Amino acid sequence: MTLQPASGARDLNPQQVRKNHLIASKLSSLYQLWGYERISPPHIERLDTLTAAGGISNNEILKIVSDEPLGLRPEITASIVRAASTRFNEYERPLRFWSAGTSFKCNQSIDGGIDIEESFQSGVELIGTKAINAEIELLSLLIESLEVIEIDQKYKMTLLIGNTYLLELILSSFDSTKIDQIKKILCDLDYIALTTLDVKEEQRMFIKTIMNMRGKPEEVLTNLQNIYGSNSYIDKLKELFTIIEPLAKEKGIEVQLDPTLGTKYKLYSGLTFSLVSSSTSAPVTIAKGGRYDDLVKKFSSSAQNCYGIGFSISVDKVRELVSTSKEKLVNNVKVLIAYKQSANLYKALKQQKELHRKGIISVISHEPLKTNDETNQLLKSNRCNKIEWID
């Protein structure tokens, strides 16, 4: 019998579970203050939903053996858009939903097998509004989310913002047969692949210029305007940065415009963004999101209000960045209730109830304790830091 978890899956210890719950609880309280209501889509969906109408590769979905094509969700947005377009179709727009739950991705391991990537996410979806103010609302909420999570201040946070239409504008000047290859190089910032790309040298230098363009929004927008002139995408980004950049700066978050910002999934059409944290090794993407109007259109039976934008936060990744000093439990005291005679068990249960009423964690010895060694061993095994004796 194999007693290990499936390849890529993992067990979380009590401390990790507690931190996940604490982070998710703080986020849910914030979402509700902003008027978002909880929705809980199923873990199992039909494959045509999970592939997000072609936005997600079929190979990345962990499939279930059944009479119809089913799988485990690799992300939650597609399921919520499906629900908004069916069960909540008659509801007035905009819809503000938040969710928290586990997603499952299927990756190919080095040996050709399958690795399961299980992750706990928390996020919001704003469906049914086209206004740029919706984008500003989502980014503002993401910025405020960082404040309630209380990430250790030693980690530097960067908010990267891009636009798929801006990326398409950049790619439009290249041969259509090479667009996919160039897009991958741009999105991956793959300088090595660029050196072997079969294009003219001036085109190679132009691609490199775009790859190096990420930085302060005002400077990047000026550079893009010098190349492409004024257009609606650049104008909207200017308007957005006017509000978002000062808000982020107040919270110590650097904002950068990245013309090459792409996503693994082809869900997004318009604004895209990623929140990246420095770490002891490599940068970590702890949140990502964007506009997915095209996805809403594909799922909707109506042509009206087919707009959507959202983000998801990786609670598992955030957990590793939260300062241990910021773990605010109701009470960090854990009491062992001990007794020397079995007849005192009833009194011990009454004492435990009183401690619980005060919000104090307490456990009862299952046997009478007669020696100091027994008592100390039980304190250690139950991870208690205080003892109360029942006479």
From Swiss-Prot:
The metabolic or biological pathway listed in the UniProt record of this protein is: Amino-acid biosynthesis; L-histidine biosynthesis; L-histidine from 5-phospho-alpha-D-ribose 1-diphosphate: step 1/9
- Keywords of this entry: Amino-acid biosynthesis, Cytoplasm, Histidine biosynthesis
BP-aspect Gene Ontology terms: histidyl-tRNA aminoacylation; L-histidine biosynthetic process
Signal sequence span is none
State the Gene Ontology terms under molecular function. histidine-tRNA ligase activity
**Cell compartments where the protein resides:** Cytoplasm
* Entry-linked InterPro entries: aa-tRNA-synth_II/BPL/LPL, HisRS-like_core, HisRS/HisZ, HisZ
Which domain of life does this protein belong to? Answer: Bacteria
One Gene Ontology cellular component: cytoplasm
The family classification in the record reads: Belongs to the class-II aminoacyl-tRNA synthetase family. HisZ subfamily.
How this chain assembles, per its entry, is: Heteromultimer composed of HisG and HisZ subunits.
Note the NCBIfam families from the entry. hisZ_biosyn_reg (TIGR00443), PRK12292.2-1 (NF008939)
**Any further remark recorded for this protein:** This function is generally fulfilled by the C-terminal part of HisG, which is missing in some bacteria such as this one.
PANTHER family on file: HISTIDINE--TRNA LIGASE, MITOCHONDRIAL-RELATED (PTHR43707:SF1), HISTIDYL-TRNA SYNTHETASE (PTHR43707)
Physiological role: Required for the first step of histidine biosynthesis. May allow the feedback regulation of ATP phosphoribosyltransferase activity by histidine.
Q: What is the name of the protein in this document? A: ATP phosphoribosyltransferase regulatory subunit
